[in-house]
Amino acid sequence: MLAKRIIPCLDVDNGRVVKGVQFVDIKDAGDPVEVAKRYNEQGADEITFLDITATNDERDTTYHTVERMAETVFVPLTVGGGVRKIADIRNLLNAGADKVAINSAAVFTPEFVGEASQKFGNQCIVVAIDAKRVADIEVDGIIMPRWEIFTHGGRKPTGIDAVAWASKMAELGAGELLVTSMDGDGTKKGYDLALMKQITSRVNVPVIASGGVGNLQHLAEGVLEGGVDAVLAASIFHFGEYTVQEAKAYMAAQGIQMRL
């Protein structure tokens, strides 16, 4: 069985790591290269760097920051934000990214995901899904939750069902899915386990849970109840509540296979 992964996430805005609540109410959390270096030293399995306003501002992710980070960090680095064309992916990989996350562009041009995965290999293509719970639906007399995809850093609704979308992205060639619950983001109430279960039961690619971690138990729940392959967190690490080592030790104590 593959070891589960802990992935600290750096949301970057104007060259600084920030953390918000439900995609707003932003707080500064430091210089991205310094923050990444700290997590590298703590034993993070991977690091994710998301330029959270790149798509909305229609500008490219800062390659210079990625280059500096890649020189400092010796674990796989996933970079996303403003990725709209094949050249963007090539430039990020050349700058030192190991994987590239596609979000809004996948919604507008789904075939872009297939093209990217054919050109670079699906192991380095991550599709990021920002999902928000909307009105429940009735299926065969049972009330079921429904989640909708949002784009542009969670600013624009699409009307697309998130669970069906996750399946489509896996079929098109995504090597991994990064699923963020917008309802949970920054709330510290735990992952949306129902959303994670719905997606992990339908796809055969690794799923990363994101949005809502407030304690170490939430990380373990993502794996044990949500069925995910990796857990992503930000504020519990950024503001010193826990270290990555503490998180790994806790998860291992719950019987989860970890790289210690």
From Swiss-Prot:
Domain of life: Bacteria
Pathway, per record: Amino-acid biosynthesis; L-histidine biosynthesis; L-histidine from 5-phospho-alpha-D-ribose 1-diphosphate: step 5/9
NCBIfam families: hisF
Gene name in the database record: hisF
Signal peptide: none
One Pfam match: His_biosynth
CDD domains documented for this protein: HisF
GO CC terms of this entry: cytoplasm
Localization per Swiss-Prot or TrEMBL: Cytoplasm
PANTHER family, alphabetized: IMIDAZOLE GLYCEROL PHOSPHATE SYNTHASE HISHF, IMIDAZOLE GLYCEROL PHOSPHATE SYNTHASE SUBUNIT HISF/H IGP SYNTHASE SUBUNIT HISF/H
Name of the molecule in the record: Imidazole glycerol phosphate synthase subunit HisF
Homology family: Belongs to the HisA/HisF family.
Listed EC numbers: 4.3.2.10
